[in-house]
Amino acid sequence: MSGLLPVAVYALKVPAGGLLIPAVPDAAATFRVSMAAIDPDETPEFEDGQTRPRATLKLIRPPADMDIDESDDDYEEDSEEDSDDEEINGGPSDKEKARKLKEAAALKELEDEDEDDDSEGDDENFDLKAAISKLVKGKAPATDDDEDDESDEGLELDEMVVCTLDPERHCQQPLDITVAEGERVFFKVTGTHTVYLTGNYVIPAEEGPSEYDEDEDDEDDEDDYDLSPDEDELVDMGDLLDDEEEDELDGLAHPRVTEIESDEEEAPKLVESKGKNKRTADSDEEMALDDMMAKDGKAKGADNGEPAPSKKQQKKLKKNNGEAAAVEQKKEAKVAKEGKEGKEGKEAKEAKKVQFAKNLEQGPTPSGQKPGETTTGTLGVKEVKGVKIDDKKLGKGPAAKAGNTVAMRYIGKLEDGKVFDANKKGKPFTFKLGKGEVIKGWDIGIAGMAVGGERRITIPPHLAYGKKALPGIPANSKLIFDVKLLEIK
């Protein structure tokens, strides 16, 4: 039933006694019956010889080979032939009104027959098939009585049992019956109780409101995309990206990174410091880069605080007084001093390594990281089911999986860098992973993240909005999201 949308409640009361009740007057709409129920407190209406209270619901319809459209054509031809007489008598007739009158007359005959207890064996004054034929055909042209009798004698109705309900053990029954618009269907109940049918009137999904329209009408819904961000949301990337967008490597298709080994490289720390500002693996790498830059700046400074001369300045000195040689000697002395300091620092770090080994032999060292907060996943670029995933920072704890409710911060961009959507402050965006509440690229790209993790996901058009154009998003657009996972519920 994924192609139909419910739009209104359908309800029908089918009384006991075998009376035929039209499913929908005039067969004017498509509907779906989802429940049949009886009232266990209702007083049973026992028929002759019946001792057990129960009700059987039946569905009745005309045979599939009955051509109702043919009767419509006959009506049109008949109306054309009599058009002159109708104009003399006061104008063209109302076909809808005539059909309703015929149906009402047929139903009245059914009710009169049901109320007459003495006429069960008498078929001379009432023809059940003829009455049903009038209801089913509805708009059939008026013919002679002999022609009606001949057509009604061949009418055989399809009668099917839907369910049997018992007020003591089985008061209701879930159903899944869809009746199309224009389809003539009747219900009747035999037994002791009235049956109540409920469901929904439905329309095709393509005629209903689009998913985007519903999101636009309810901007406060926590699962919506805010596709018209405020100006203050279009500024810098904030604490989500940490200036990673400006990285020159992002513009390269296949960047090559060369690892430089140095004597000053610290051994990997097995235990975080006990200070207030504890850092993750990524922040340690950033700190190491900052330290290298700071030491390089100190190496270029003179003892009196003056900066070392540049190559251009050295050339000028050489031309003037030949003082460049003295400068070179001074620079070599500084390098020797720094080499000595570097050697001492290396020995101190080797001592640290030994100290860590001793601690490991003595037992686990207390740490600020809890046992369950191990990092999840690996850094780098990978492709999963067509979605490009670039982990910038690994989170801690269990990985998000289908069925989890996740809280996210994100910034959405097009390939040209234009931001079309963002959630960087206030209430985070939450949704249930893997349940189709977001575009397919998000269900694929968010899976596997841990709390605190940051990644960039590049989603191809067929996993985003495809050929559908949205405000700020052209059709067939590749979308790039920088996301951060805040919480897993």
From Swiss-Prot:
The family database entries (Pfam families) matched by this protein are listed as:
FKBP_C, NPL
Where is there biased composition of kind Acidic residues? Answer: 66-88, 110-125, 143-157, 208-250
Q: Where is the signal peptide?
A: none
One GO cellular component term noted in the UniProt record for this chain: chromatin
One GO molecular function term of this record is:
peptidyl-prolyl cis-trans isomerase activity
Q: SUPFAM superfamilies of this UniProt entry?
A: FKBP-like (SSF54534)
Q: What is the predominant subcellular site recorded for this chain?
A: nucleus
Which EC number(s) does UniProt give?
5.2.1.8
Segments forming domain PPIase FKBP-type: 406-489
Where, subcellularly, is it found?
A: Nucleus
Q: Where is the composition biased (Polar residues)?
A: 362-378
Composition skew (Basic and acidic residues), residue ranges: 93-109, 267-282, 292-303, 328-353
Give the reaction(s) catalysed: [protein]-peptidylproline (omega=180) = [protein]-peptidylproline (omega=0)
Keyword field:
Chaperone, Isomerase, Nucleus, Rotamase
UniProt xrefs under PROSITE patterns: FKBP_PPIASE
Activity regulation text: Inhibited by both FK506 and rapamycin.
Output the InterPro entries linked to this UniProt entry: NPL, PPIase_dom_sf, PPIase_FKBP_dom, PPIase_Fpr3/Fpr4-like
Q: Which residue intervals make up region (Disordered)?
A: 40-157, 199-378
What the protein does? PPIase that acts as a histone chaperone. Histone proline isomerase that increases the rate of cis-trans isomerization at prolines on the histone H3 N-terminal tail. Proline isomerization influences H3 methylation thereby regulating gene expression.
Q: Which family does it belong to?
A: Belongs to the FKBP-type PPIase family. FKBP3/4 subfamily.
**How does it associate, per the subunit comment?**
Binds to histones H3 and H4.
Q: State the name under which the record lists this protein.
A: FK506-binding protein 4
Q: Which species is the source of this protein?
A: Aspergillus fumigatus (strain ATCC MYA-4609 / CBS 101355 / FGSC A1100 / Af293) (Neosartorya fumigata)
Gene for this chain:
fpr4
